[in-house]
Design a protein with these regions (language model features):
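N-terminal glycine-/serine-/threonine-rich beta1-alpha1-beta2 phosphate-ribose binding loop
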Residues: 1-145, 233-237, 274
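Active-site-lining helix/loop region of Rossmann-like oxidoreductase modules
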Residues: 9, 48-51, 62, 73-76, ...
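C-terminal active-site/capping subdomain that shapes the small-molecule cofactor and substrate pocket
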Residues: 39, 274-383
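Short catalytic-loop micro-motif centered on adjacent basic/acidic residues
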Residues: 130-132, 156-159, 182-185, 213
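Rossmann-fold NAD(P)-binding glycine/threonine-rich loop
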Residues: 136-151, 159-180
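Rossmann-fold dehydrogenase core element
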Residues: 173-186, 207, 211
Length: 383
């Protein structure tokens, strides 16, 4: 198989975990279960087939450095589980746009000079797949980078809660260019969203009505620091909330569901603590309560999914699939163009990996009566 040339936008904790992970699993062999990987071999592509071609950031101490050095630069504070040798990949100065909010500006000194020509660099480095790790609330920056991806002729993995793959106008532009996009908003391996989704689906399947629920999240990384600026949270709250409510079997009042980040606790570093509470009605109208506490290292938890999303994006490129790639988007992302249960989405992504034609465009699942339309008309104001 050919190599997968990957460019990274935003060299933060998530990028650090992905780069470390590619090195960590580079010599993994065999076909047995490998802890941390959903797929060692994904249609012939292994983690060792991923190589980094370019990186973009605005941080003064990251721009100009080798990617292998920049991933360990503060304020990055994720766990260091691999020592990555120099990659020969410099971090380029990207545009700032709306990427740095009121809280981040105190910890992210901006590199001097003008932004470099991103589309040109992507072409010159023969990049196949661009992965976006921009901060929450980077609406303009995400759309700007999406345009550069289109101009450079790359596939796009949109890990941030800015709606690109799930918006018809953007999805159409990728389809017209014959370029795949997997998005939007990465779903961790075993994170708050997927645990909450599966429990919600379990309630429905077992005949329990979910009456009220909350999901509270605390973390110590710059993602949680950035999200203290509530004005940047609109897309994030929409994304996390609909990921859960899409699994319901009945309508739920907006006041009875609360999902979102809650606070920044610096000493947690890149760890995230999540508290989920669910109150329901079961047999005989008898109440039921469920509480879950989840503790994870946030960024490795997402990298375990991105390492598959990148390979699926390259598969789509190889197969000439353009536009939103529904199967991997539905399994890997919180806000895909079309929601399925996680069991359904897993079956679809396995079929896609095998090359089953129908997996590229799965049949429409009729939304349940309470669900929002999948094309999110309210999101047009985010353009």
């Amino acid at each position: 198989m050919s190599k997968i040339r990957v460019a990274i936008v935003g060299v933060g904790n998530c990028a650090s975990s992905l780069v470390q992970g590619v090195h960590f699993y580079g010599n993994a062999q065999g076909t047995d279960f490998i802890p941390g990987l959903m797929h060692l071999d994904l249609a012939g592509y292994r983690p060792s087939d991923i190589e980094f071609s370019a990186a973009f950031d605005v941080h003064a101490k990251k721009v100009g450095r080798d990617l292998a050095e920049a991933i360990y630069e503060a304020p990055n504070n994720t766990i260091r589980f691999a020592d990555v040798p120099k990659l020969g990949v410099p971090v380029h100065r990207g545009p700032t746009h709306d990427g740095i909010g009121a809280y981040l500006k105190d910890v992210v000194p901006l590199a001097p000079g003008k932004a470099q020509n991103v589309a040109k660099i992507l072409k010159e480095t023969k990049t196949d797949v661009v992965v976006s790790y921009l901060p929450v609330g980077s609406e303009k920056a995400t759309q700007w980078y999406a345009q550069q991806v289109l101009e450079a002729g790359c596939a796009f993995v949109n890990c941030v809660p800015v709606f690109i793959a799930s918006r018809p106008e953007w999805e159409r532009r990728f389809a017209e260019r014959g370029l795949p996009i997997i998005g939007d908003d990465i779903k961790s391996q075993v994170g708050a969203t997927i645990v909450h989704r599966i429990l919600t689906d379990l309630f429905r399947k077992r005949g329990v009505r979910l009456d009220r629920t909350y999901q509270l999240n605390f973390g110590g990384n710059t993602d949680f620091l950035n999200m203290l600026e509530r004005e940047r949270l609109l897309s994030k709250k929409i994304s996390k909330t609909q990921a859960v409510t899409s699994q319901l079997g009945h309508p739920m009042r907006a006041s009875d569901v609360h999902v979102g980040p809650s606070d920044h606790v610096p000493w947690l570093d890149d760890r995230k603590w999540c508290y989920i509470r669910m109150e329901g009605t079961t047999f005989g109208n008898v109440p039921l309560q469920c509480e879950v506490k989840l503790e994870v290292w946030d960024s490795p938890n997402s990298a375990g999914v991105v390492i598959d999303a990148v390979r699926c994006a390259k598969l789509a490129l190889d197969r000439g699939v353009g536009g939103a790639v529904l199967a991997p988007s539905s399994y890997f992302m919180k806000s895909p163009p079309q929601q399925f249960t996680d069991d359904e989405a897993r079956e679809l992504v396995e079929a896609f990996i095998r090359g089953d034609a129908e997996a590229a465009a799965p049949p429409e699942r009729k939304p349940r009566a309470h669900e929002h339309a999948p094309r999110h008309t309210k999101r047009s104001k985010l353009a």
